[in-house]
Amino acid sequence: MEMTANRLIVFDTTLRDGEQCPGASMTSRQKLEVAKQLARLGVDVIEAGFPVISQGDFESVSEIAAQVKGPKICGLARCLPKDIEAAAEALKAAADAARIHVFLATSQIHRRFKLAKDEEEIVRIAVEGVRLAKRYVQDVEFSAEDASRTEPEFLAKIIQKVIEAGATTVNIPDTVGYAVPEEFASLIRYLFDHVQDIDKVVVSVHCHNDLGLAVSNSLAAIKAGARQVEGTINGIGERAGNAALEEIIMALHTRPDAFGKIETGIQLKEILRTSRLVSRMSGLAVQRNKAVVGENAFAHAAGIHQDGILKKRETYEIIDPKIIGWEQSELPLTKHSGRAALENRLKILGFELEKEEIDNIFSQFKQIGDKKKFIYDDDLVSLVEGQISRIKETYELEYVAVTVCSGGIPMATIKLRHGEEVLVDASTGDGAVDAAMKAVDRITGQHGHLVEYEVKSVTEGKDAIGEVTVKVNFDSKKLVTAKAASTDVIEASIKAYLNAVNKALL
């Protein structure tokens, strides 16, 4: 990436910090597809995971490092040799595009109660961590965890030392979302004034949203001179989430008068597609009134507003929806459309799929074509994401029959395949879906408590595909999010619940 004084590096941590949100875990295949879309979006750095934390994270980072080209691929590590070595190994395939991101808490409360170490020990550990990471990669980022609650003098000291040790990016996180904009901007300015070699590195910020100020704090820091911003798509993340990258990007794009002509490599037309993909893959719905990408972001209900929009869009819209991807779909496909037409449309939508995956999607496409007249892009996206989200099926649905009559007790009969064994059971319930879920529990021996159940229409019309998302708690230990789609909502509900069971058994 070509760096100028006004070039902002966009660092995406959706696959690492964003995935820490309860119920938002993604499979390696889902993470890879999100990473490919992030590359199309034009982010500069993808933080793909925390390799030492689990074998799954290690493999996911390795796969993304091998297959995703364009952005830098980053792995997180504590300032511990085992962490740094795991990150280096996972990032091998990225070669010169690899970045190791080491972090260490610096605030007084963390030094005293979490780490039980004094300032000198903290500096020593940070310097050793950066030096070790530098043996493996040229691009090393250091984060001073809880920087916004760290004494400015000590923060400046440790930043100076890690720069001398070889850090190329220094990150100033508002880890618990405590800062307010002017205060955070003042901290960034303080570092520019008091760290001797700070002009030799990139100054980064990473803000959390506990007080609803993550985006505001990030923008204030950029105005103060920060030239890397870290965040997630849709603002997902633990607790109240992270800074929403799409909001930061559009604020910079819409208000150059306020922030200066800050340049990024972001392809604005990919914003909406990226938002929707992350929502579907993570199972976290985007709130309807969310800025930029919410369903209501460009909806105008008041008559006066509608009249103004019709006369001149700019009366009530400060962003042209088309520039971020809010456009009408192309002509729909039908059951008579062939495999070549389907494959071509999938490429236009940005999906790169294996032959076997396209075969499976084409088979489902034909089945849906028998049930509905037109198949729209959103229908295709739902089919693709169902394919991407597939996991090893310990139990596979073979047959379902539901009996519901007015005044009677709903009953469901379920047939599942478990390897070579076919298992059948039935149950009654408060409704058809409840009865089916209880029958699945009887067969699998799992005991799922349905925490959330959401059904939405993928497209319009009576023949629309219904997409069901469930959050299920198994034995009060594991919260699992799963989804499925079908023109039959009851079938989609059962498949979604069974997907959750299979996920819990992994």
Curated annotation (Swiss-Prot):
Reaction(s) catalysed (UniProt annotation): 3-methyl-2-oxobutanoate + acetyl-CoA + H2O = (2S)-2-isopropylmalate + CoA + H(+)
Domain of life where this protein originates: Bacteria
A single MF term (Gene Ontology): 2-isopropylmalate synthase activity
Domain (Pyruvate carboxyltransferase): residue spans on this chain: 8-272
Residues covered by region (Regulatory domain): 396-506
Binding site for Mn(2+): 17, 206, 208, 242
Protein localization: Cytoplasm
Pathway: Amino-acid biosynthesis; L-leucine biosynthesis; L-leucine from 3-methyl-2-oxobutanoate: step 1/4
Protein EC: 2.3.3.13
One GO process term, biological-process aspect: L-leucine biosynthetic process
GO cellular component: cytoplasm
Names of required cofactors: Mn(2+)
UniProt KW keywords: Amino-acid biosynthesis, Branched-chain amino acid biosynthesis, Cytoplasm, Leucine biosynthesis, Manganese, Metal-binding, Transferase
InterPro entries assigned to the protein according to its UniProt record, in alphabetical order: 2-IPM_HCS-like, 2-isopropylmalate_synth_dimer, AIPM/Hcit_synth_CS, Aldolase_TIM, LeuA/HCS_post-cat, LeuA_allosteric_dom_sf, LeuA_bact_synth, PYR_CT
Keyword Cytoplasm in record: yes
UniProt similarity note: Belongs to the alpha-IPM synthase/homocitrate synthase family. LeuA type 1 subfamily.
Subunit comment: Homodimer.
The protein, known as: 2-isopropylmalate synthase
Gene: leuA
